[in-house]
Amino acid sequence: MPKCDVKTRYIPATFAWIVLLLTTFLFFFYPCQFYVKSHPWVLAYQGVITFFVLANFTLATFMDPGIIPKASPDEDCEEELRAPLYKNAEINGITVKMKWCVTCKFYRPPRCSHCSVCNHCIETFDHHCPWVNNCIGRRNYRFFFFFLVSLSIHMLSIFSLCLVYVLKIMPNIKDTAPIVAIILMGLVTILAIPIFGLTGFHMVLVSRGRTTNEQVTGKFKGGYNPFSRGCWHNCCYTQFGPQYPSLLNPKKYASRRSQVQNQAISTICNDRSGQQTGAGSGAGGNGTAAVSGGGGGVGSGGGMRGTAVQYSPRSFYDASREKRGIQVKTYMAEGNGYNQRSGSTTLYSKLSPGRECSDTDLEPPPASQSQDCEPTPPLQRHNSSSFYLPQVSDSGGLNGSVSTGGGGGGDSPRHMRLYHPRHSPHARPRGLDPQRGYTSDALSPDHPVGYGVGVNGSQQQQQQALAAAAAAAAVAAQNQRSATTTATPTMQQRIKPLGVATPLVMASPVRRSNPGTPTQPRRPDFIGLNAQAVAQQQQQQQQAAAAAAAAYYEYTSGLPPQHPQAPSIQQQQQQLLLQQQRVLMQHQQQQQALQQQQQQQQQAAVHAAHPQHAALAQAAYGGSPQRRFLSEGELVRQGAGGGVAGGELSYARSNNTVDNIRELAGSPQRGVYMWKDTSPGFTNNAGQQQQQQQQAQQVVSSGIGSSAGTLSSSGAAAGVMPHAQYMTAGGGAHPLIMTHSRLQDYTIQQQQQQQQQQAAAAAAASYHRSNPTSPTTMPQVSGAGQSYILRYGGGGAVGAAGSSGSLASVTASNPATGGGGYQPALRGGVAVFPPNPMGNQGGGNLQTQPSPQIKRKQTPTRPMSFVRALEMADSMEMQSLEQQQNGGIPGSGSVGNNQQAGGGGGGHLMQSNASNSGTPDRASIYDMNYEISV
């Protein structure tokens, strides 16, 4: 409605009052005299109706309809950098828009609208009625509705009584009284259509729970009205619901609230200075005061760093009683026990304590509240003894001499980390501690004893020690206060599983990852095993087991989950594991002599056979430390099997590696990567495969490798082989990590098997990595038979996957068995196949087999994939490195060079399979049809 002049606004209302009063007076003065003597109840009845009409009309005209005062200048300044012009509020599951009022300078509540005539925002705005010269809103709608109902009854009564009066005195129709009665009947007839129509319209609106504004604008047309309570309840609530106080005069309510105003809403300003101002500062401990008056919001968290200014809530209110009409949003109170978090941002309270996702219009001024910070916790009320917040004292300079609660990095005592048994791969709730992700495997409760400590192992061990001390201090404080607190999920904990980059996540040194690039691949840092490191590591793992509960791994191991529990239980599990290893060692040593005899017999048979006839029987797939996720097949096979080789995936995978497909290719790889052989002699004979597997079980032996990479021990070279990056042990060892107590058992085996290495020279096969982006060199110990160094098994006479911890069965094909070729047991995923290796057949007899040719188009239209480009780049780079380590001499096919490369202790064990070609690896690279199973 257009804005009217002040003088013209009163004309309709004045006319309405004149008509109402005049008609009522004329009715009582003329027609009603006829009913006084004969029907006196008519006068009383009509008097009551008239009273309700005038009373409701007066209230509807002069009552505050629910005006929301305009924002004060202080509040207006606060909203200079406000959010967009719309905000959403959810009411009964329906999202309702809240518009920004440019005139009143605030977001209008639901069902609120700005009246252009009154120039005010009206709560539950219905319409502006010119006949009452007032808006009809939340506070006066019931009186307006009662006015319409009573006026309708009043009009009907006047019309009916005047009609009866005229019919009674028809002979005297020319008198004054009958003429007045006829005029009143005519006036009622003229006003009947609008009055009765308006009354009926509002009856419908009341029954539906709508307003005139909502009905006219069609907000809930054909949809659900979240404000409706049902027909009967709508009528009762409209007429008999609560009467809300007026907001135009808040001073009249100030005296009523004076008794409760002493309860302050405190603002906590944490700084990193680490100054403790004594018991007066509380456990928050920095004594920084921040007072935000009048909604202006002076945030002084960083500017007043290290000060000890304190304002009592009572004195603050006493000094600002004259400003009671101005909204004060944040105040400073004594310390409430809320401790400093590990984040560098400053925490402020919002309008309501404990709120997290508040609207932007209710936020403090800019730069006062970070969206990643945790909001103010529930605060301690004045003179309250039932609020259990432990006062944590200074713990000797921990975390910058700022008192911390449970958990390393400064967890709050109000948010104690709960140690729950975790059987799910999903992330557990954590606080804002820096080490909340990518914890080293050495500190994992699921990690078996004997794994090498990662790069950040020492740092994380220190953090674990600090975390244990802080947790003990927090538990002691909890016991003193005899209270029990539970951790509540915060906004940061909800954002973290979603992958939102927060300053704390990006600033954490543990979370940083530098994946390799095609031009600059990064080598993983491996640390070899020795006796001291293993012993020290086992002791540290047992001590830090209780504090390492926050470690989380996406790749679950096959062992039973070892969650934080009593150290005695973990020691029993470790002792049981060592006993099983010793039993297996004794059993394998007894079978060693028989195995060596069988190996010598089969070596002679393999020397006479072609290299492509060497059979590879795929054993239990063990995975790779360079993959972080289980495939579908691995999930199915995880709990299957028994015995030595049955426990598939019974190891803890290294999770913080940087050269994995997920980080480089950008997609989680969940398939099983396998090779295929298209060489001549590849058959699908099921009986032959069973024969090979039975033969493999007779000649099986296992290799023990470090957690650095995938190793393979084959043939007579299955002994301990020291390497620059690897330490391999074979010859009947259990496929677990070799500890220092068992190195002496392999000293004799090493000497015997080194002699066998010199006697039997193996073929040099091109290595193939399970992860094309990994630059890890796959050393191969030469044997009589050919071996494929794959991450799911080994080949030749003897093979093992060292880091996987699974026993790789190897079959040596004998011409007497009546078949050639090999048949790897494909167990899921996309089958991807390497070329058949070429090798030395005995003393100097180098038989070169051409790589199998995969049929391709003459002019391939598809460009080289990213994975293949990385594979080619890595192969060429590793070839140059191998040539440099061998003194610049490429693989010449001589037995001496092969023996030197196979038995050497320092260089990479990688032999060229194409001695007649200048580019030995390039030929096989183009034959690799490497694909990724997604």
From Swiss-Prot:
Disruption phenotype: Lethal at larval stage. RNAi-mediated knockdown results in extra vein material. RNAi-mediated knockdown in the wing results in tissue overgrowth due to enhanced cell proliferation. InterPro entries: Palmitoyltrfase_DHHC. Residues 99-149 form the DHHC domain. One of its GO terms (molecular function) is protein-cysteine S-palmitoyltransferase activity. Coiled coil: none annotated. Pfam families: DHHC (PF01529). The DHHC domain is required for palmitoyltransferase activity. Palmitoyltransferase that catalyzes the addition of palmitate onto various protein substrates and therefore functions in several unrelated biological processes. Regulates tissue growth possibly by regulating Ras64B protein stability. May regulate CG34450 mRNA levels. Belongs to the DHHC palmitoyltransferase family. ERF2/ZDHHC9 subfamily. PANTHER family: ANKYRIN REPEAT AND LEM DOMAIN-CONTAINING PROTEIN 2, PALMITOYLTRANSFERASE ZDHHC8. This is Palmitoyltransferase ZDHHC8. The gene is Zdhhc8.
